[in-house]
Amino acid sequence: MGGPLTAAGGRGDGGAKAVEPLRPPPPPDPKTMARWYQLEALERAVRGNTLAFLETGSGKTLIAVMLLRAYAHRVRRPDSRRFAVFLVPTVVLVGQQARVVEQHTDLVVKQFCGEMGVDFWDAATWRSQLEDGEVLVMTPQILLDNLRHSFFRLQDIALLIFDECHHARGNTPYACIFKEFYHPQLNSSASDPLPRIFGMSASLIYSKDLNPHNYSKQISEIENLMNSKVYTVDSESALSEYIPFASTKIVDFDDSNISSELHANILSCLNRLNKKHIEALDRKLHGSSLENAKQRISKLHHTFVYCLYNLGVWLAAKAAEVQSYEENSLSFWGETLDKNVEGFIRNYSEEVHRELSCFLKNGHIGEKFPADSQDGILTPKVHCLIRTLLQYRHMQDLRCIVFVERVITSIVLEHLLSSIHQMSGWNVKHMAGSRPGLLSQSRKNHTEIVESFRKGKVHIIIATQILEEGLDVPSCNLVIRFDPSATVCSFIQSRGRARMENSDYLLLVGRGDVEAQTNAEKFLASGQIMREESLRLGSISCQPLENTLCEDTYYRVESTRAIVTLNSSVPLIHFFCSKLPSDEYFNPLPRFDIDKASGTCTLHLPKSSPVQTVNVEGEGSILKETVCLKACQELHAIGALTDSLLPELDVPCDEEPDIVVENKIEQPSYFPEEFVDNWRSFSRLGIYYCYKISLEGCPKTASPTDILLALKCDLGSDFTSSSFKLPGGQDNASVTMKYVGIIHLNQEQVIIARRFQTTILSFLIGDDHLEVSNGIKYFHEMQVPIGVVYLLLPLVSGRIDWCSMKFSSSPIYEANNKHMTHCHSCKDIDLLQTKDGPFCRCILKNSIVCTPHNNIFYVISGFLDLDANSCLPQHDGTVVTYKDYFKTRHGLTLTFENQPLLAGSKHVKVRNFLHNCYSKKEKEPGDRYSVELPPELCRIIMSPVSANNLHIFSYVPSIMFRIQCMLLSVKLKVQLGPTVQQFDVPVLKILEALTTKKCQEEFSQESLETLGDSFLKYVTTRHLFSEYRLQHEGILTKMKKNLISNAALCQLACSSNLVGYIHAEEFNPRDWIIPCLDYDERDNKKISFLAPNGMYSQRKMSIKSKRIADSVEALIGAYLSTAGEKAAFLLMKSLGMNIEFHTEIPVERKISMKAEEFINVRSLEGMLGYKFNDSLLLLEALTHGSYQTSGPTSCYQRLEFLGDAILDHLFTEYYYSKYPDCTPELLTDLRSASVNNNCYAHAAVKSGLNKHILHSSSELHRKMSYYLEEFGQSFTGPSYGWEAGIGLPKVLGDVIESIAGAIYLDSKCDKEVVWRSMKRLLEPLATPETIEPDPVKGLQEFCDRRSFKITYEKNHVDGVSSVIARVKAGETTYSATKSGPCKLVAKKLASKAVLKDLIAGHKDTEAAAV
């Protein structure tokens, strides 16, 4: 491997910044710092495929960088989207080499490694990643996988660099790239270009074969495989003037064993402990956990024996001590222990440590090294290592690496060297691979250790082969091979770490070990031999590899060119199985039955796989690969593998929503066309359709009045006779609306009616007297264009009150002292001075006036026996005249002192009478609102106007808004089409479904949404279960999510033009459009026509996508609750949902077997109260995925998927119909209390279903046994509420759902049959009286009301979770600690305890609210 660059071609700091979007100035040309052999290698690489074979530290990476610069113009050509790929064998090298390329080129560099989740990327994701990438640095498996899945092709790559190319051997990813793709294309007649190949390595030989006569063959093989020729120098001396070489020395030691007696005693002790703990496992564990634990204890036993022989008693004891650490839950060979095994492993290790410690003498290790070695405390090899290191105590700034073979050796040697007081000045660390394991180290840990090593804070690193290649390690002045190198490559690379001047490379060899000494001599000579052989082969051309892919060794998808080979078939099957549904008791894995004698192999896939068994015959050495290749073909044929040969992780493309809906979208809010017209044409119609609107249940007025609504058209049968409530009014106010026929009005009458309604409504709604009065004054000058046009005519005794309308709508300025003809009812003409001049008393009486000095409107009921000089009592008890009061308070001088004061009252503004939160205690107008007004301060707005008209017209905005929404609901019914329109769904029920909670009206969509949501899931689940019979539960769940997600439902609503019908905001009377009134553009009250869908709109609204999705669900619920399942289903179809609702779902059986051979069918049927026609459905419903033995061919997961939706819908429908008046919150709580896995699990145990489940999981067996033993008596009560079944294994609840699915299928989709059977198991059901609130929710609500702070502290020890709940209530802190099998259980228990204490400590609050 070539390292990062320095000015001399050596290593640098690698600290380059990320490439910016805009290219920075190009870095200096590396050629200016290159050595002669680097330039020579570059020239060779430009001309043809080249393998650079040069020593570690010679600057091979610089050659790669210069080659990338030479190819820069090819990866930047806009007409050819090609790129360069830099392959490195380890993840840590990805970032390291990427930084080097970024530092020395201006190319756009991208890094890829497995932890980025690339295994799950599809072709589109990769295309997006490649859009601007010019150099891709990655591990070889990623490139190989991409080529196999055909995400990109070899011809897309202009330059392909292989770091540490000696890994190109056998079936490694490096080799497979050439065998599966490069050579087949090289040998084909295709004209597609192949990438330029450049490899680099410090050793071309990567084998244990030290026979120099075989070097030529191995070099030729790698040249032919990579279709490249080797470049190297003729000897080390050619490089010695640029890089220093270490002095290699052999350090021998007396390789004698510990005394035979001590050896026998310790070995006997280890064997005894191994046997003891294996026998204990047989008594306490079962199934896979037992086998797992036995294997691990056996491996540990061999490890301790190895340490005893090779390291000594002290280090063997230290190995046992390290393995017994509580935080160490993983064995050091990298296999994860299941939770039930951890304790047994620790106990075994602890006892081994105690026993071995008895063989150790008292005293500090290292006080007498020769004696320790002689007594077997340390082996002579370890003693030699210590002695050798101590010889370098004089060295300043020691940088030493000790290479060992095993991870455990590195760990215990760190402990030993750190314990020796003679080495107290040196800091010792160990480094091992980053795979999961004992004291596992992450790449971050490695980087920190190497950085400390570079800074001199760490002096000695005990390392496995991880430091031979990969990490950018500073040059060392001492490298020791504690364990011999396994290969020539290992020897050369470890020696290459010693690159400081006068450095030493020491080999520890046992005295008399002739083989080791011979191997060391061969290792030393190997470098020169490889150079000579490479130069000798230089003139021989590479030979193409023939038949690297035989027809029966691969399977190719023709449409995509994706390929799976014998090499990749086994990993692909394992990857496929890993994506099948699993749980904490079962990991889906393939199982192989191989009979080498007969040359047959049977592959058993998990029961959730659509293909269960595959059989092949063939060559014994590749049977497993062959059967997996055949399985891949079969899985692809049925769609379980995509055309890219990856597990089907997502739904088919045609099921996915086309867009991702943003959180909020802007849509026009619709307006009913029945209320829209052109004023000119409306006023000349002559014939109008009339509806009588009566307000009932309001406080009685002098003479109750009604309103006549006159329209251009008939509103339809839904409005022939209808009624609705006004919850914001008093005394249960309601409105009835009845069609009364057609009337004829002339244009003058229409104008009078228009003036009246616009005047009175402007007054009731408006605030600015100038705006209102000017609007009335210049009314006759305005011409209303297209807008909201209809008439509201007051009725008296069933007749239109034209008299009131005519006079009250006449312009006031015409009734001054010059024109008194209108005062026909006045006996005496008596003028009073007003703000606008003198007016007759009759004009002022029953008028609406405004006082401009404070801009307040008043209703005048008559005259008072008071004038400006009358006394006005003040709040402080003093008395002033009205004249003085207005002068002092408002700065107004009253000049007409003798005029009587007017009896006025403030008019109550219109409000939202649809609001559900109106308080009956709200103040009503009365004496407290009475005022005395001097006429000269008043401006007359309207006269005369009756109190009755004012009263009923104050309700008009709310009434007409409700009618407006009802009209839109009728329009929606029509829009949904004739198939849906045939069902008689009340308009108000549709309106309920379209009204969000935010509107705060008497009804909202929440309950209907809950009902519709359950039906939507039920129907969708049925459809998917029936249509995709080969897909497992995981895929079906993803499909369902995509079909009915908020994004998908929002998309449907937008496509169906449904959004504009939604009532998403609280009604504000100020925003209501007064009919027949012209509005300015800036008022945002203009009506516009939406050409695409033929609707009218007033404005645009911003609405969350979830609210839109909720409305779709609520609409489904409305049709379901009033017209049945067929209506709801047809509604879904009309909205564009591509689903089917078959009356039956046929069950296919591939094999025949008797369920009675596995389960007690008769007993189960008695328990369920149902007799199965196909008892194999019951068998499937009780089969857990871990039951991999022969027999049932499927596990319960698909039935669980079906049954979950059925039960959810049955319970929701039951509670919705059982408690029709319950609040949405209560409906949700009832549903949540009954429809959850804990409740189902409780019912399963209560009924004894747990005894019939087929499984092979010892952990599941242990958990069920624990609960039955500890809490058996608690399984007799109800199966609802948060405490029922809490903590029970989820499998128990799953079985209830799967049995529901089985009965549903067996009964030909009869929900009633399922309900009777499930109700039998789950009774008694929750009721509003028995439901218990969730304690976590209850505690949160309690604290929110009082602004208390809640904190939770969670812990998990030995499989038991504990939670501490704390509440800070003022100066007092309440806390409770509870334990449980999981954090959720412990949290609920702790919350319950704290809540109980809080309620007791705050008795002044109503406990009911909790």
Swiss-Prot record:
Site (Important for activity): K1290
Cofactor(s) needed: Mg(2+); Mn(2+)
Region annotation (Disordered) ranges: 1-30
Residues reported in the UniProt entry to bind ATP: L54, E55, T56, G57, S58, G59, K60, T61
Record bears the keyword Oxidoreductase: no
Record keywords: ATP-binding, Endonuclease, Helicase, Hydrolase, Magnesium, Manganese, Metal-binding, Nuclease, Nucleotide-binding, Nucleus, Repeat, RNA-binding, RNA-mediated gene silencing
PAZ domain ranges (all copies): 827-942
Domain spans labelled Helicase ATP-binding: 41-222
EC number: 3.1.26.-
GO biological process, one term: siRNA processing
UniProt motif (DECH box) ranges: 163-166
Gly residues bias: start-end ranges: 1-15
Residues covered by the DRBM domain: 1334-1400
Matching CDD domains: DEXHc_dicer (cd18034), PAZ_CAF_like (cd02844), RIBOc (cd00593)
UniProt-listed SMART domains: DEXDc, DSRM, HELICc, PAZ, RIBOc
Subcellular location: Nucleus
UniProt: Mg(2+) binding residues: E1200, D1294, E1297
One Gene Ontology cellular component: cytoplasm
Domain Dicer dsRNA-binding fold: 569-655
Domain RNase III, residue spans: 969-1124, 1161-1308
Oligomer status and interactors: May interact with ARGONAUTE1 or PINHEAD through their common PAZ domains.
The protein's role, per its UniProt record: Probably involved in the RNA silencing pathway. May cleave double-stranded RNA to produce short 21-24 nucleotides (nt) RNAs which target the selective destruction of complementary RNAs.
Protein name according to UniProt: Endoribonuclease Dicer homolog 2a
UniProt organism field: Oryza sativa subsp. japonica (Rice)
